[in-house]
Regions:
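Active-site segments of SGNH/GDSL-like serine hydrolases
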Residues: 195, 199, 209-245
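Serine-esterase "nucleophile elbow" of acetyl-processing enzymes
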Residues: 77-166, 179-188, 349-358, 362-366, ...
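Bacterial N-terminal signal peptides that target proteins for export
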Residues: 40-50
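Short, Lys/Arg-enriched N-terminal segments with co-localized hydrophobic residues
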Residues: 21-39
Length: 427
């Protein structure tokens, strides 16, 4: 059928539809037709001319492009098929209206503009894969970050996708909120995925840390999209409940791996040993399941991304407080035991190395001459050396303080390596 025949048929259909459904023409329109003594045939012809003119103007407005952008886009098929629809429903904790910011990143990538995606978290994000008993059957032995990145490169093969992996083992959102500026936001990411649900505690202090981390990302100058990923141990331990409260407050997409593996184990689909070789870190199977969940979410947004409006500028109030919005890490090369140093802050923390060689010990921390806490650099019998971070001092105002780290009695001569001074200042 030619275009003009389609237009003519449309005109006739519209006229008959109005007449049959009792949707009468307005009095003004009837007078217009009567004055010109238009028969039904002439009226259809008139509508045909009008529709042709409208179409012409539409084509001119579209710079001559007659091909309409499809409402539903084709999506890439997930690399695996471990997750059922029922399990996916358990994983997707966000609301439909929360996807506009992620859709905007997809639209940018579809236009072949370079995009940057970043993931910040602990060892799971860093790429640790434990040995599960079913891993021999897993075809894609990749970390979830690699699988997450693969969706973007497969979906937009002609777009440059920059990937920032800011995962550091044995760290939580307290260190995360202090390092996010340098490790993530300095790259001006379009999308940031946050994963700290295994390493964070469920305490109110931990919730404040996580809230400030997420809020700091959302308030960045380039307004990146944010996704929250809730990993979990096979024994069910994680901070999902606390973290989800932050996600609901800010209306963010939330994907729960924890919900899915608990359902899988309850249904007898997989055992704990298949999902993790050490209870904490996902096996290759666990990472594959996580990657599939992320692909399902991204596909669900992408196939209808044209329907999402432009994301609103983030302006929601803080869920807890804004204690760490100005958090950062100061270098500590010159910090020595028993030698005071000066720092201006409202809160103070220390990042220090814990070692398994037996040379670590207990050290007291003093602020303005008063004892405020201690750090323990000894990790004898542990799984390995690592960088610990903890808050030592907090106040309601920003001011200059004199800080000193002292050997405690019985630990003289023990090693104490300070890696960073974690500070924040209140407005």
């Amino acid at each position: 059928m030619t275009l003009h025949r389609q237009i003519r048929r449309t005109a006739l259909t519209l006229y008959k539809h109005n007449k049959q459904r009792g949707r009468q023409l307005s009095e003004e329109s009837r007078r217009f037709f009567r004055k010109r003594k238009m028969t039904m045939k002439k009226r259809v012809k008139y509508l045909h001319i009008c529709l042709t003119a409208v179409l012409g103007l539409t084509l001119l407005a579209g710079c001559g492009q007659t091909e309409k952008v499809p409402e539903v886009r084709e999506t890439v098929t997930p690399l695996t098929s471990y997750v059922t629809e029922e399990e996916w429903e358990a994983a997707d904790m966000g609301q439909e209206e929360n996807n506009a910011a992620v859709a905007a990143v997809m639209k940018k990538a579809a236009n072949k503009d370079d995009i940057t995606i970043a993931c910040i978290g602990g060892s799971i994000t860093q790429g640790t894969i434990s040995n599960g008993t079913a891993d021999k059957e897993v075809g894609f032995k990749k970390s979830y970050v690699e699988l997450f990145s693969r969706w973007w490169t497969d979906t937009f093969p002609e777009t440059k996708i920059n990937v920032i992996n800011a995962g550091i083992g044995a760290t939580d959102s307290y260190l995360g909120v202090h390092r996010v500026d340098e490790d993530v936001l300095s790259y001006n990411p379009d999308l940031v995925l946050v994963e700290f649900s295994v390493n964070d505690a469920g305490s109110n202090r931990a919730r404040i840390n996580y809230d400030n981390l997420v809020r700091k990302i959302l308030l960045a100058d380039n307004h990146p999209a944010v996704m929250l990923l809730f990993m979990g141990q096979t024994n069910g331990s994680n901070a999902q409940t606390s973290h989800a409260l932050v996600g609901f407050q800010y209306g963010l997409p939330m994907i729960s791996y924890c919900n899915v593996i608990q359902k899988m184990m309850d249904d007898g689909q997989y055992t704990a040993k298949e999902l993790s070789g050490d209870t904490t870190h996902p096996s290759a199977l666990g990472h594959a399941i996580t990657g599939e969940l992320l692909w399902k979410y991204l596909n669900s947004v992408y196939e209808n991304c044209n329907s999402y409006p432009e994301p609103a500028v983030f302006d929601k109030p803080a869920f807890t407080n804004e204690k760490y919005l100005h958090a950062t890490i100061l270098p500590a090369e010159d910090v020595k035991v028993n030698e005071p140093f000066t720092v201006t802050c409202s809160s103070l923390g220390l990042e220090y190395r814990r070692t398994i060689d037996g040379n670590g010990g207990q050290f007291g921390v003093y602020v303005d001459g008063e004892y405020v806490g201690s750090i323990n650099t000894d990790f004898s019998g542990g799984w390995g050396n690592y960088a610990a971070a903890e808050e030592i001092f907090s106040a309601d105002e920003t001011k200059e303080h004199v800080v000193e780290i002292k050997e405690m009695e019985g630990y003289e001569g023990k090693s104490c390596e300070i890696l960073g001074i974690l500070i924040s200042e209140l407005d």
